[in-house]
């Protein structure tokens, strides 16, 4: 795992790791945590993570990490603790989309989705727990999805991985609570991200209708009348990482504009 450091953060700053941080929700989460005063290790397989960390500036560190590889995730955490002295927050954000009829799903496509979304979340939580248990404190935030609770046709594998992330979160909150570690899940809804637009393009092609029409149909089903943004998700992660959430653990919080009331 290669790392690239930028300006050192202030001494004793809280330290976070965000996976999948080169773009999309992960980049917005990393930016918010930096503004909150945290030092952030931004991890991704995307080479653009170095440019992203440079763009965010002071306190941002770039790291190459494939979350499907347990050894790389362990190394990411070890490097973070060695260089910055602590780990206060791990945001297991890395994820991929993908879907289609189950009869058409290849073994490789299945393994890719499960490997990143579920294996990656497990390896991340395990590595974070191993670092946080001796410290007697910490916060882990996983990224689920509203489709982990109610999964549409054609998204079975994706939904199954996110349901697994939600279940893992709830179990780890019970398991790690006695060590002072909080574990929560943020479940985005229909977000204005490339992953979501790609899914809608597949839907558009399958139905033979214009992409713009599909986008409007989805938007019409959101009570707040708009797609979500990375800023919306990052705000909830920021809260869960803060002392204001000191008594919040084992929760799955939808960020979906009311699309899936629970």
Task: Give the predicted meaning of each segment.
Residues 36-51:
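Conserved glycine-rich Rossmann-like NAD(P)H-binding loop of the short-chain dehydrogenase/reductase
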Residues 122-125, 133, 224-255, 260-261:
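C-terminal substrate-recognition "lid" of short-chain dehydrogenase/reductases
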Residues 91, 177, 182, 248-250:
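Short, small/polar-rich loop/turn modules that mediate ligand/substrate recognition or access, typified
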Residues 130, 174-178, 246:
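Alpha-helical segment proximal to the catalytic Tyr-Lys
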Residues 125, 161, 169:
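Active-site helix of classical SDR
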Residues 101-102, 109-114, 218-219:
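Substrate-binding pocket helix/loop in short-chain dehydrogenase/reductase
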Residues 145:
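Residue(s) in the substrate-gating loop at a strand-loop-helix junction
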